Amino acid sequence: MSKTYLITLTPIDKFFFGGEITFTRDFKNKDKESRALSDEEKDLRKFDEEFSSYVVRSNLFPQQTSLLGMLRFLLLSNSGEKIFKNNKIQDADGAKGLIGEKSFQIEPNDFGEMDFGKIKNLSPCFLRRKTTGDWENIFYAPFDKDLNVKFEKGNILLDVGKSQVPDISYKEPKNGSEVTFNQKDGIESLYFGNNSILKEKDIFLEDTRIGIDRNFEGKTQDGAFYKQISYRLTNKRKISKDKYEDHKLQFALKVEVDDDCTLPQKSIVSIGGDNSQFSLESKHIENTKPDELFPVITGELFCSGKVVLISDAFIDEVDLSNCMFAINDTVPFRFLKSDLTTQDYYKFSGKSKLLRSEKKFLYTRGSVFYFETEEQITAFEKALKAKSRLYQIGYNYYKTIKQ
């Protein structure tokens, strides 16, 4: 038996959700005598060369693996000192029953579900918005929102060598005339609910920090300049030239846990690369199908059906072979690995350290895949669900729209 909670996360201040790019580190010998770099320092330097910069920008949403880590830590920190004390596990067996033996990991060709103890599954993270009435669920809009994607005879994707782009157009807002879409113009990032359409700037406000690192003697270090772009959630949006609408925003997700597991109603939790703090509230709710949270999608459909990603998704290339056409984007995916022996969650060197996963790429939420037949849609849905380990923590969620 299990039960479902709605968890809301309200930022206490600005937040920073770490991405693929991190700040550089200085590996120069601090001693006067030079020495060779250790193997661990060489590995970190290699990582810096590929993924470091003096300018870093937060992701807009927390990674699902970070939310899972937050929940696992929340259960541990509320388990009592016999199991968890001074941020260290005291009883490995007790901890295993609560949170499982390992954090999220992907093994080669193994996408079966993992054991996370009392935690059964997570939904994708989404936004909730409130003006004067009830809270409204807000999701990233499909990339083809307000676009007409028309497949005419002879314009269907048969294979990669014979592929043709369908006719894509949109209605001009001012006069309603149909205009051919030019991909050079790009696609605006939109968010929508059943009653709202929001631009990115209506939700997220940049908070930029620029500085120079200095050593303990007050001297500027080499490569010390940095620029960090964090975000805040807005408290209003502009609806006309001189008119604003007040609103409240928060992150949210559904979590299914064992029936004997009780989440705290309120807590302060940390998420992200800078341990950004959030006010967590949990509420017991009735379980619903994943796509029932997603707003209704309207508009004409010029093929048998399409699949819209509600969350980022891991999709094998072979599973895209029957797709007529797609409007999509990808994002790097990397996560931190730990187990019950991990003692230091802030270092990547030494004993009992955190480990970085290999980099993979996910198709981003909002991506749209078009199909000619219902059989092709069913096969694609099956492929998404087959990655049950990812689905378990909020990836590979989708909404299917058919004629």
Q: Can you annotate each of these PLM segments?
A:
Residues 1-403:
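Conserved active-site/ligand-binding neighborhood in enzyme cores
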